[in-house]
């Protein structure tokens, strides 16, 4: 039975340790499961022979909290957690969230805002010279100058604000071991400048080190156009085979240097990483607090792949995991699934077999294996590349094996499915088996919008592709004698989306009968194309101007249009229709969205009847219909 890594001096004593090689400070609760970045990095280091202690959610108001495990021999590792701490804390309207799924008991407030920076500064108050190495999603996506939505300003590289010595971006398994080995061999942390997948800072750039020089921070902060240009240079240098080393100046005597990304892991390396001895659950010290809610989403799920060549503008995966797909072998996944079947809480259902995009189980084309992804072209956008190989045969074979495992009743796919890639496959085998075996009544996909010029800014396929998918989905369901639904994820207020576009989306919802219970407003998170559009008003790919809905009232109108049937939204919907010049949608005909006057408030007895339906009543089917109509979505899990 695997043991958790030490979280206290007592645990260290039990192992006979007097000092950790690394103390890993994390913003999440300690969950030893490969869906949590800190679990993978700590187990990879342990596998390489290093002693790692875990310091989870230390009290940032108390400098002594980071000393609980003593000074590490080689350095501190710092991660904000599985999410950027600001996304974790705040909704898109900048309101404080009430719960934190990555904290024991779901309690909010156990980590600071800008957690990586705060933790590092806390360490520096006590340990002046001990190396600090930062990583994880927060550090990775803030590695160079970036727009910060919450402060509404362009921030410097997190490496500078955190006073850290080295930043590891991307997934980090290979680079962390290389860094550890260098430090273990006696190398000074400031000399560790040669490892791919790292970012470091220097007083003077090495004239013998070829770099692509980005605009300096002062000019970026002064001119949004410069920032858009700089970001696109970064965007075109994310492939490990072709990326150049990037240099970002901060004044005359401070520079941040980003080395090219790490090469993708081989299948053997992926298998080894996921085959390490994880406890696969949260630390037992959290039991009295109710455990860690986030484990419920992944405990009986399988991570099949990494990377994504989908190119959604609002997604940062290209910056973090890259575009080249990396997969685990069937044997590795079957072994993990078989082990799941012996867990006492396993009920026979594998919740997911996927990754960033479930149906990407191979590189987009053969060229990517040796030359990487094209720096100036996308695989699926604006339409599938002629060199792309759309093939689900390996995924189909894997799913069949999983379905046949003793103790497995059903295998679900809950990661995002790219419907354009699905349609590009000439074989219908996967589509048919997806419908027959792997959906629990509804399939969640992410068309995001219906206006083609908005979809172009999003990096998504045109609306006609989604309609073709719906027709095929409906046809296969009918052939299989099944009645399953589609849940479309839709987004309001994305750059490029005007009020008229929002009205067009509302008309589509009217025509399909879909009534979304949840509406996702565009969230400008660090290091996405869409965020750069939001900040600069420019599309970095073309440098053309983009309309950006920033006014809170307009954003509220766009959201209200997606839920125009809600009486509480009547005033906003009417105002939006008038401003968009669409008063033809106010009236009594079937195509109208609202009546000329607001709806009457429901009577109290009617409200009571709605809240407490009679036992003989059937469950409401509001929002659910046969394809191409869609069911009202449950809590979103991801967008592809």
Task: Label each region the model flagged.
Residues 165, 273, 308, 333, ...:
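Conserved, mostly hydrophobic/aromatic
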Residues 25-30, 289-316, 349:
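N-terminal pre-triad scaffold of radical SAM enzymes
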């Amino acid at each position: 039975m695997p043991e958790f890594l030490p979280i206290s001096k007592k645990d260290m004593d039990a192992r006979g340790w007097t000092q950790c090689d690394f103390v890993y400070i994390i913003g999440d609760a300690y969950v030893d499961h490969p869906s949590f970045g800190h679990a993978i990095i700590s187990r990879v280091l342990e596998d390489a022979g290093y002693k790692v202690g875990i310091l989870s959610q230390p009290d940032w108001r108390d400098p002594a909290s980071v000393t609980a495990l003593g000074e590490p021999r080689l350095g501190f590792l710092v991660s904000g957690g599985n999410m950027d701490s600001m996304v974790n804390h705040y909704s898109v309207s900048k309101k404080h969230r009430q719960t934190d799924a990555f904290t024991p008991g779901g309690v909010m407030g156990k980590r600071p805002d800008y957690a990586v920076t705060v933790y590092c500064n806390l360490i520096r108050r006590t340990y002046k010279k001990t190396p600090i190495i930062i990583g994880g999603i927060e550090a990775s996506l803030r590695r160079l100058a970036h727009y910060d939505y919450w402060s509404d300003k362009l921030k410097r590289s997190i490496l500078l604000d955190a006073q850290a010595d080295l930043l590891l971006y991307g997934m980090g398994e290979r680079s962390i071991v290389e860094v550890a080995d260098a430090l273990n061999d006696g190398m000074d942390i400031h000399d560790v400048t040669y490892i791919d997948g790292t970012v470091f800072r220097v007083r003077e750039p090495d004239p013998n080190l070829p770099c692509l020089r980005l605009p300096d921070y002062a000019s970026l902060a002064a001119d949004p156009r410069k920032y858009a240009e700089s970001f696109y240079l970064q965007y075109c240098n994310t492939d490990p085979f072709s990326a150049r080393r990037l240099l970002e100046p901060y004044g005359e005597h401070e520079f941040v240097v980003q080395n090219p990304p790490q090469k993708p892991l081989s299948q053997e390396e992926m298998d080894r990483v996921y085959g390490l001895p994880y406890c696969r659950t949260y630390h037992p010290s959290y039991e009295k607090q109710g455990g860690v809610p986030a484990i419920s989403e992944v405990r009986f799920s399988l991570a099949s792949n990494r990377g994504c060549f989908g190119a959604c503008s609002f997604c940062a995966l290209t910056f973090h995991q890259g575009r080249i797909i990396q997969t685990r072998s069937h044997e590795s996944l079957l072994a993990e699934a078989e082990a799941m079947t012996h867990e006492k809480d396993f009920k026979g259902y594998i919740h997911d077999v996927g990754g960033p995009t479930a149906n990407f189980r191979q590189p987009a084309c053969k060229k990517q294996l040796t030359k990487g992804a094209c720096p100036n072209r996308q695989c699926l956008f604006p339409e599938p590349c002629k060199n792309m190989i759309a093939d689900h045969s390996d995924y189909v074979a894997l799913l069949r094996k999983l379905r046949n495992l003793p103790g497995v009743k059903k295998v679900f796919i809950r990661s995002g499915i790219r419907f354009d890639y699905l349609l590009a496959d000439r074989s219908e085998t996967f589509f048919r088996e997806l419908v027959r075996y792997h959906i629990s009544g509804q399939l969640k996909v992410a068309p995001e919008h219906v206006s083609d010029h908005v979809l172009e800014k999003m990096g998504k396929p045109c609306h006609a592709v989604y309609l073709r998918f719906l027709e095929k989905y409906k046809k296969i369901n009918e052939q299989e004698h099944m009645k399953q639904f589609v849940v479309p994820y839709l987004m309001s207020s994305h750059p490029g989306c005007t009020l008229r576009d929002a009205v067009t989306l509302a008309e589509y919802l009217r025509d399909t009968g879909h009534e979304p219970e949840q509406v996702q407003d565009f969230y400008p998170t660090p290091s996405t194309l869409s965020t750069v559009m939001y900040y600069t008003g420019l599309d970095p790919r073309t440098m053309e101007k983009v309309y950006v809905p920033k006014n809170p009232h307009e954003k509220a109108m766009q959201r209200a249009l997606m839920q125009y049937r809600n009486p509480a939204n009547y005033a906003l919907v009417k105002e939006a229709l008038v401003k968009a010049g669409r008063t033809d949608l106010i009236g009594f005909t079937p195509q109208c969205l609202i009546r000329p006057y607001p709806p009457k408030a429901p009577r109290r007895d009617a409200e009571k009847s709605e809240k407490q339906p009679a036992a003989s009543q059937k469950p409401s089917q509001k929002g659910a219909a046969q394809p191409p109509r869609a069911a009202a979505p449950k809590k979103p899990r991801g967008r592809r």
